[in-house]
């Protein structure tokens, strides 16, 4: 491939160089794309563009679609299970149209689709890894800002816009300016009860929502190495929340163990060859990054956001900050607006904040490990009176696994709603939304104004904190139970 060099390189530089098919001075590099993920929201206009130009999908074998953003995750109607794949379950006309359009486009252009009711349906960034489609060293794109999730495997994965979706569909390539690189060096070990979600929220609070802008970030250090693949995906998933183009973690035995035997992973001698190559995907000892950040994992405690962006967060033991204490006027102004929207007063203890809704799910924390963590806390307890708790698996496979382990019974016996797979309350594009003024503890990735429903107030938390909060009715950690 164009761009191969013997100079010391970072992980990101190695993957980038292996995919450059054309490079010219003063122009973006043209990258080959190994995997293109689609969903119903950002793909319709891209397919329309192909149709107007008389083009086909260049590599349907490298393209996969699912239905996730607009899909309902369940109703009180007991027949919902049997009607799961029926479009009649989608009551919103816009959502229904988007689902119908995706199905029609995939059928016309020969794209693999996992629709509602399919055994592999789920959130796009959950099903890619669980099917073994996501692999180290790949380039992966999707018309979705949390595509960086796949970087947990040592893939270069990033979100793209609709016009870029069309370009990849038509050519299986994408012109991209070469990004800068950054290392996040996580020193020390996480304390018991502190999760990957706490780590990444603490990182974003430290560097700010623009701290990674223009960079491909590599997360490094012993604390990262000790994380499961689910934990690593949580970290990589939120790379965009501090401005990074992508986030990557070098593959290792944990990665290989996760992928081994999955449906689309290499097998036999191909597996051995793949692992041999994947082992080369590490940053060279003498390679340099354009920027570096250090985070001390040993000092992190359960973390929660108080404002309206993921960088406005603090340890659960802290209080809502006073805007005047912040360093710059833009920060102070943003904090004032956030406190007004969130209906919070400076100095209020975060543990004193009562919630109306608790949401466990999303492409950040909707995997089996996340559900186990929430169930472990919830076991033997009841959801507080007046609190609604939704537990939404990230995929049909996760749901099936959870039910095989009896997690669904723990949730329902505690008074939580056990629902079907989808993006759900992560965003206000389906029936699972907050009402105006409702306050939620959510394991999702964004706490923007109106993100979970017009006028809804979101506090980002880990699955254990979410479960403890559901029991107490106020922001809490498992240690409080």
Curated annotation (Swiss-Prot):
Alphabetized UniProt keyword annotations: 4Fe-4S, Amino-acid biosynthesis, Branched-chain amino acid biosynthesis, Iron, Iron-sulfur, Leucine biosynthesis, Lyase, Metal-binding
Pathway assignment: Amino-acid biosynthesis; L-leucine biosynthesis; L-leucine from 3-methyl-2-oxobutanoate: step 2/4
Record PROSITE patterns: ACONITASE_1, ACONITASE_2
Cofactor(s) listed in the protein's UniProt record: [4Fe-4S] cluster
EC numbers for this chain: 4.2.1.33
Keyword Iron-sulfur: yes
GO biological process, one term: L-leucine biosynthetic process
Catalytic activities: (2R,3S)-3-isopropylmalate = (2S)-2-isopropylmalate
Matching InterPro entries: 3-IsopropMal_deHydase_lsu (IPR004430), Acnase/IPM_dHydase_lsu_aba_1/3 (IPR015931), Acoase/IPM_deHydtase_lsu_aba (IPR001030), Aconitase_4Fe-4S_BS (IPR018136), Aconitase_4Fe-4S_dom (IPR036008), IPM_dehydratase_rel_enz (IPR050067), IPMI_cat (IPR033941)
EC supergroup of this enzyme: lyase
GO function term, MF aspect, one: 3-isopropylmalate dehydratase activity
Cited Pfam families: Aconitase (PF00330)
Biological role stated in the UniProt entry: Catalyzes the isomerization between 2-isopropylmalate and 3-isopropylmalate, via the formation of 2-isopropylmaleate.
HAMAP family: LeuC_type1
Family stated for the protein in its record: Belongs to the aconitase/IPM isomerase family. LeuC type 1 subfamily.
Protein name: 3-isopropylmalate dehydratase large subunit
Organism: Salinispora arenicola (strain CNS-205)
């Amino acid at each position: 491939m164009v761009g191969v060099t013997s100079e010391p390189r970072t992980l990101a530089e190695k993957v980038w160089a292996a995919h450059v098919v054309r490079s010219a001075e003063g122009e973006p590099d043209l990258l080959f794309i190994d995997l293109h993920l689609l969903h119903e929201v950002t793909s319709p206009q891209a397919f329309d563009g192909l149709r107007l130009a008389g083009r086909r999908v260049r590599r349907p074998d490298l393209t996969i679609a699912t239905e996730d953003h607009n899909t309902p995750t369940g109703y009180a109607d007991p027949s919902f299970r049997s009607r799961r794949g029926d479009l009649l379950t989608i009551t919103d006309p816009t959502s229904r149209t988007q689902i119908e359009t995706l199905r029609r486009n995939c059928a016309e252009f020969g794209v693999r689709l996992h629709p509602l009711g399919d055994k592999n349906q789920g959130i796009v960034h959950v099903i890619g890894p669980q099917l073994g489609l996501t692999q180290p060293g790949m380039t992966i794109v999707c018309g979705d800002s949390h595509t960086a999730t796949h970087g947990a495997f040592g893939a270069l994965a990033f979100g793209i816009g609709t016009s870029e979706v069309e370009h990849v569909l038509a050519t299986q390539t994408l012109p991209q300016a070469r990004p800068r690189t950054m290392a996040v060096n996580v020193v020390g070990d996480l304390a018991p009860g502190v999760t990957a979600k706490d780590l990444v929220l603490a990182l974003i609070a430290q560097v700010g929502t623009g701290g990674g802008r223009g960079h491909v970030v590599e997360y490094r250090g012993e604390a990262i190495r000790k994380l499961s693949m689910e934990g690593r995906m949580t970290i990589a998933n939120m790379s965009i929340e501090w401005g990074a183009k992508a986030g990557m973690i070098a593959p290792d035995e944990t990665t290989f163990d996760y992928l081994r035997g999955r449906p689309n992973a290499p097998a036999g001698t191909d597996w051995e060859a793949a692992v041999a190559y994947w082992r080369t995907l590490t940053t060279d000892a003498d390679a340099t990054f354009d920027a570096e950040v250090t985070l001390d994992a040993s000092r992190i405690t359960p973390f929660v956001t108080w404002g309206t962006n993921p960088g406005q967060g603090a340890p659960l033991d802290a209080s809502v900050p006073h805007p005047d204490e912040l360093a710059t006027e833009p920060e102070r102004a943003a904090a004032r607006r956030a406190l007004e929207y969130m209906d919070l007063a400076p100095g209020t203890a975060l543990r004193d904040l009562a919630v109306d809704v608790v949401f466990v799910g999303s492409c950040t924390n909707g995997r089996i490990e996340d559900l186990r963590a929430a169930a472990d806390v919830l076991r033997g307890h009841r959801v507080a009176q007046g609190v609604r708790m939704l537990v939404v698996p990230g995929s049909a496979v996760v749901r099936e696994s959870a039910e095989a382990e009896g997690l669904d019974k723990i949730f329902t016996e505690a008074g939580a709603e056990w629902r079907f797979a989808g993006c759900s309350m992560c965003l206000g594009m389906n029936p699972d939304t907050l009402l105006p003024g409702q306050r939620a503890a959510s394991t999702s990735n964004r706490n923007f104004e109106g993100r979970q429903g017009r006028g809804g107030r979101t506090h980002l938390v880990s699955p254990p904190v979410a479960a403890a909060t559901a029991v107490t009715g106020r922001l809490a950690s498992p240690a409080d139970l």
